[in-house]
Amino acid sequence: MDKSGSPNASRTSRRRRPRRGSRSASGADAGLRALTQQMLRLNKTLAIGRPTLNHPTFVGSESCKPGYTFTSITLKPPEIEKGSYFGRRLSLPDSVTDYDKKLVSRIQIRINPLPKFDSTVWVTVRKVPSSSDLSVAAISAMFGDGNSPVLVYQYAASGVQANNKLLYDLSEMRADIGDMRKYAVLVYSKDDKLEKDEIVLHVDVEHQRIPISRMLPT
């Protein structure tokens, strides 16, 4: 008797037929596995550059140089008339200035626009000798001499610009923490009056690590 026509044989034959979409599903699985491997490799690569206790992140965007950390200070410019200027010298905390011979590698300024911001400002950081003042005329000349980078930050109808950082490299100057009192942040309000509640400036000073007291205050 020929069993090929039996119900069991028919069911076996049906099971052995490739189901529709099995090949495309297999391809999708392979693609997913490949993507997973790529993500794992990327994650491993990124983990190498992630900050650690001994290698902190400088300004939340890149790692400090080995052996360095950073100190942040906040500046709130006052009201600045259209076409006028503002300058303020850097003032680091006493806990940092106590180690005035520690080298400084970079200064970074971050502009944080507040909800009312609708202006155009120019921002820079400059070494200003203690004998020099921060008058409007003096600051105007510093903006025009081209001796330091200038960040132009402005309001746009679609939102404020993404680039809000200015990086000033001091590594070749061998500047130290004690020199920071000779540096000043300068602001120029170009197109209109800058109100005092329009921007906040965050200044990050990357410097060599300083000793940390392990004793609790008594």
Curated annotation (Swiss-Prot):
Main localization of the protein described in the UniProt heading: virion
Alphabetically ordered keywords of this record:
Acetylation, Capsid protein, Ribonucleoprotein, RNA-binding, T=3 icosahedral capsid protein, Viral nucleoprotein, Virion
Chain positions with N-acetylmethionine modification: 1
Places the protein is found: Virion
Pfam families membership: Cucumo_coat
Q: Name one GO cellular component term.
A: T=3 icosahedral viral capsid
Carries keyword Acetylation? Answer: yes
Single GO molecular function? RNA binding
Return the Basic residues bias intervals. 12-22
What superkingdom heads the lineage? Viruses
Instruction: Tell me which InterPro entries the record gives.
Output: Cucumovirus_coat, Cucumovirus_coat_Asu_sf
Stretches the record annotates as Disordered = 1-30
Q: What is known of its domains?
A: The N-terminal arginine-rich stretch does not seem to be the major RNA-binding region that allows formation of an infectious ribonucleoprotein complex.
Sequence similarity: Belongs to the cucumovirus capsid protein family.
Q: What's this protein's function?
A: Capsid protein. Probably binds RNA and plays a role in packaging.
Protein name, entry field = Capsid protein
